[in-house]
Amino acid sequence: MPLPLTVVPIPGPGAEDVLVTPDGRVWTGTADGAIHVHDPVTGETTTVTATGGRPLGLENLPDGRILVCDAHRGLLALDPATATLETLLTEVDGERLLFCNNAAVTSDGTIWFSDSSRVWRVEEWKSDLIEHTRTGRLFRRTPDGQVTTVLDQLCFANGVALTSEADAVLVAETGTRTIRRVHLNADGTAGASTVWVDDLPGHPDNIALGSDGLVWVTVASPTDKALTLLQKSPRAVRGMVRRLPERLKPSPKETARVMAFDSVGRLVHDLDFDATRWHLATGVREHGGRVWLGSLVQPAIAYGDVPGR
């Protein structure tokens, strides 16, 4: 039986990611560019600012600000006290970021972040999966502003997270249902890359390290056999399907599922929440035994409790 899920309306469409800040408040960004904060104690939700783009992944920065991965505008830093925004990065090697998606931040302020596609923007995310462009990338930005490409040719690079020991960075490949692991060297640079978890039962989106030390993974949709078959088809066929009417393209199923893994990739939790009022989980944060969820399509965030916590 699906687990109960509490829905929290947000004044904006597509609350894609969620972030719990040290004060316990829950932040999210919506498709209209707005950044909102919800107070679980009072139940109040406030719109703080707008980026002028499409905010996706959110992350705590060591200086108390909030990192915003804006699909249109790149990496931004939000001061929650003043609601001011600073642009940290818009391009890499002279090429503007087309689909800045998600990030993880180490204690020294180094930002590891994903760019999902060099071909399609967030509004055409489905086109990238159908065409199987494999143009996703993982980057590393040091506090002095230097940026290096860590991985490329990823199949829709998506969620990024640190392991509990901070000895590796993980990045989800939505198109291949895989999570890759990049070892961190003693000096904080990227080492070898390996597959951490593969053959997931669905397409992963955002991932995050929880307060329980586990890596939480959203399963945005169960494995789509049509999409899997299509990705093996000739390029011309993929292009033809991309141009079909939206109703004829492969689409996510209406589920609300998250999984949690330990530091070596062993499954610890597989939670299937009630999706009758809320679905398509794309963002996740575990905090004190509660799982907060964001959705690319819902004008709401949601939460449920981890059984046994």
Features from the language model and the residues they span:
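Sequence-structural signature of mature extracellular/luminal beta-sheet repeat domains
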Residues: 1-309
